[in-house]
Design a protein with these regions (language model features):
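Short beta-strand/loop segment that forms part of the nucleotide-sugar
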Residues: 30-39, 60-65, 89-90
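Donor-binding/catalytic cores of nucleotide-activated saccharide
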Residues: 69, 92-203, 211-228
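C-terminal subregions of glycosyltransferases and related glycan-biosynthesis enzymes
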Residues: 214-298
Length: 298
């Protein structure tokens, strides 16, 4: 039985995508891998097809016109056939032992007739070229080894929040939430890690470093100068996150979740505001004012 669909969105990922895909293959009998070739102009399509030819029972390839990271996630979710779903960016990779732990837990649940709507694991900021690593844990928020609800969670630290890298969702939860990511837009992972949360009724935390988030490419969207260049996209995503969930409704059922989600919106607002201030132009000031006015009405 295959338990997790891994979707790997790829755009001109030839230099590093093998590291990512190879990290998913050790347990290929239990996973589905969907490689999304998002209109690449390098050797990405050929590499993807090579994997599909070598591992036809595990790897599927979708070739599509370029639509950006969000469209790749959308395509993967639309074609996912497993109970659980996770996005792995093509320059990142998973830890083998951690993946084994997760699969063993899923097998155990299957025998018991149980399931989790959302699985949370640690992730690692991996500064590969500098040989530095920093693990981001959630052991202060979630009790390990127990099926939890939002009413059971602890308090997130100021720099701690749920991100795409740390989450595995039950596929049906994602579909039920209606999460669809905008095309040709950066920072859409904020939507993916936010909108489905009110639909999650069972949470399971494994205190293991599953996801390695590669830091080091100059064109990464988290780079400060790149973020300033793409500030309109950051604002666009911030507005979507701020308006896609009725937090008053969430508060009635899960007050702790509502508190977390409110803080999440506040963090995104702060990021947008600070970078608009750093840009410092008259146009940036107008955008900052418009953003705050938008927030007041939503």
């Amino acid at each position: 039985m295959k338990y997790i669909t891994f979707t790997v969105p790829c755009y001109n990922s030839a230099p590093y995508m093998r590291r990512c895909i190879d990290s998913l293959l050790p347990f290929r009998d239990y996973v589905e891998i969907i490689i999304i070739n998002d209109g690449s102009t390098d050797a990405t399509p050929e590499i993807a097809d090579e994997y599909a030819l070598r591992f036809p029972e595990t790897v599927k390839v979708i070739h599509k016109a370029n639509g950006g990271h969000g469209s790749g996630v959308n395509a993967g979710l639309a074609h996912a056939s497993c109970k659980y779903f996770k996005v792995v960016d093509s320059d990142d990779w998973l830890d083998r032992r951690s993946l084994q732990k997760i699969l063993l837990r899923m097998m155990h649940w299957e025998k018991q007739g149980k399931q989790a709507d959302m699985i949370v694991c640690n992730y690692v900021y991996d500064h590969l070229y500098e040989n530095k690593k920093k693990s981001m844990s959630y052991k202060n928020v979630f009790k390990e080894g127990k099926m939890l609800t939002w009413n059971d969670i602890g308090i997130f630290s100021p720099s701690q929040y749920l991100v795409m890298h740390s989450l595995i969702f039950r596929t049906e939860i994602l579909k039920k939430s209606g999460v669809t990511l905008p095309e040709h837009t950066f920072y859409v992972d904020n939507i993916f890690a936010y909108r489905p949360l009110p639909y999650v009724e069972s949470i399971y935390y494994l205190n293991t470093d599953l996801y390695h988030y590669f830091i080091g490419r100059e064109d990464q969207s988290v780079n400060e100068e790149i973020l300033k260049q793409r500030i309109d996209q950051q604002i666009f995503v911030t507005k979507i996150v701020a308006s896609c969930v009725d937090l008053e409704e969430v508060k009635e059922k899960y007050p702790k979740l509502a508190r977390y989600m409110t803080r999440n919106v506040s963090i995104m607002m702060a990021i947008s505001s600070i970078h608009l201030l750093l840009i410092g132009s008259e146009d940036a000031q107008k955008k900052r004012t418009d953003l705050w006015n938008y927030m007041k009405t939503h």
